[in-house]
Amino acid sequence: MADAVVIPGGWFGPNAPLLMYAGDVAERRGATVHRHSWSQEFPKPDQAEIESWVAGEIAPLIDTISGRPLLIGKSLGTNAAAIAAERSLPAVWLTPLLTLPWVADALARATAPFLLVGGTADEVWDGNIARRLSPHVLEVEGADHGMYVPGPLTDSIAVLSHVVVAVEDFLDAVAWPSS
C-alpha cells in the first residue's frame, strides 16, 4: 500500500486547493493520504531554524508509515525537502521556497525524483534554480505564490488544473506508486 504525506504552507491547511488536489491524485492511485496540520505556531519562515522545526513536525508522522511515502508540500512545507533528501523520498513541491538556501541545498541533495511547481510572479520562485535541480518542473507565467494569475479568476482555476496534470504526469514518469 502506498502512502502520501501532505505538508501545508504557513497560512492555509492541508485542504487548500493546490494541496487537496495534489493529494487526491495520489489517493486515486490507491495511496493512503496523511494530511498534516501544524500543531503549533511556526518560527519565522525565513530563518534557518524553520527547517528543523518542520522536520520536528513531519518526521514523527513519516516514522509511523511503513515504506517510502510520497511527500507533497507547499511553501513552508517545502522545508521538509531535507527529510526527503535524507530518506530518499519522492516529492511534489508546490511553490517551493527556492530563494532560501537551505531549501535549495536540500533539493540539490535529493536522490529521489521530485516535481517543482511555481510561478514567475512568485518572489520565492526561481525558474533557473528549479530547472537546474529537477527535470520535472511546471513554471506558470505570471503566477504568484498562491498560483493566482492576472485576469479573471477562471484563469487561476485553470492553473489548478495544469498543476493536477503536472502531478499526474510526474507520478506516471516516475512510476509511482511502484508495484
Model regions and ranges:
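A conserved short beta-strand
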Residues: 86-101
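Gly/Ala-rich beta-loop-alpha elbow adjacent to hydrolase catalytic centers
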Residues: 71-81
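Acidic beta-to-alpha connecting loop that harbors the catalytic carboxylate
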Residues: 10, 120-123, 143-144, 151-152
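Short, conserved loop/helix-junction motifs that constitute active-site signature segments
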Residues: 85-86, 105-111, 131-133
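Serine-hydrolase catalytic machinery in alpha/beta-hydrolase-like enzymes
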Residues: 1-67
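Catalytic histidine-centered segment of alpha/beta-hydrolase-like enzymes
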Residues: 45, 143-160
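Conserved alpha/beta-hydrolase "acid-adjacent" motif
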Residues: 15, 119, 123-129
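Short beta-strand/loop motif that positions the catalytic acidic residue
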Residues: 110-111, 115-118, 122, 140
